[in-house]
């Protein structure tokens, strides 16, 4: 099936047949190994980039800023293939979302991720979770022994959300045993593993604004 043959539909059920994992039939991602450190840009800035072959694209931004990759999958799969690497879209799994919405967001992250991998996009799993109950499905479809990505942005605001993040992170280490964790945001002392730290997008955005003002 070519990129051009993929037609849009509301749930992207025509993107292909993939190996499925878990009770909810989550598309299985293949492990990806990214030994080198590269620069990551947020998706909503990727369209204007010219030197794409040396950059990575992340989706640790508000969902509305990247819904277009879901609404027009063939077009953006072709676009993302021009980058060095791409992370799976981080559809939100907020703890106050209904379980149905959480599982659907996890499923469509993997539906796109498996589709991208099939068409030659170097796709790194972005792993996320909600609460302890989400452990029953939120790691389904994630590869073991792979480079993965996580973000702590927004989880360090209070004791409860911080604990949810740390507990889920530890569970991820046990279940997936990632070879490297590309980590956006503050890294709590309790988080172990082979971490490659990156500043969150709002910090890099602030630096960009300051540099732009200085140039003027």
Enumerate the language-model features and the residues they cover.
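Non-catalytic, usually N-terminal nucleic-acid engagement modules in DNA/RNA processing proteins
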Residues: 10-77, 97, 175
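Eukaryote-skewed repeat-based solenoidal scaffolds used as protein-protein interaction platforms
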Residues: 44-50, 56-57, 69-213
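C-terminal accessory extensions appended to soluble enzyme cores
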Residues: 1-31, 194-216
């Amino acid at each position: 099936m070519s990129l051009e043959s993929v037609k849009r539909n509301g749930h992207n059920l025509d993107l292909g047949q993939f190996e499925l994992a878990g009770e909810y039939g989550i598309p299985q991602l293949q492990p990806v190994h990214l030994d080198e450190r590269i620069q990551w840009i947020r998706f909503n800035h990727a369209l204007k980039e010219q030197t794409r072959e040396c950059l990575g694209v992340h989706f640790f931004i508000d969902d509305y800023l990247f819904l277009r990759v879901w609404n027009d999958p063939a077009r953006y799969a072709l676009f993302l293939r021009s980058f060095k690497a791409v992370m799976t879209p981080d559809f939100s799994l907020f703890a106050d979302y209904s379980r149905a919405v959480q599982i659907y967001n996890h499923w469509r992250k993997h539906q796109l991720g498996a589709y991208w991998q099939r068409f030659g996009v170097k796709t790194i799993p972005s792993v996320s979770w909600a609460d302890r109950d989400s452990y029953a499905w939120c790691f389904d479809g994630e590869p073991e022994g792979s480079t993965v990505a996580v973000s702590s942005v927004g989880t360090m605001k209070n004791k409860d959300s911080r604990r949810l993040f740390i507990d889920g992170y530890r569970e991820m280490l046990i279940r997936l045993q990632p070879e490297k964790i590309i980590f956006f945001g503050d890294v709590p002392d309790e988080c172990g593993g082979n971490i490659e730290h990156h500043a969150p997008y709002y910090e890099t955005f602030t630096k960009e604004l300051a540099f732009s003002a200085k140039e003027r």
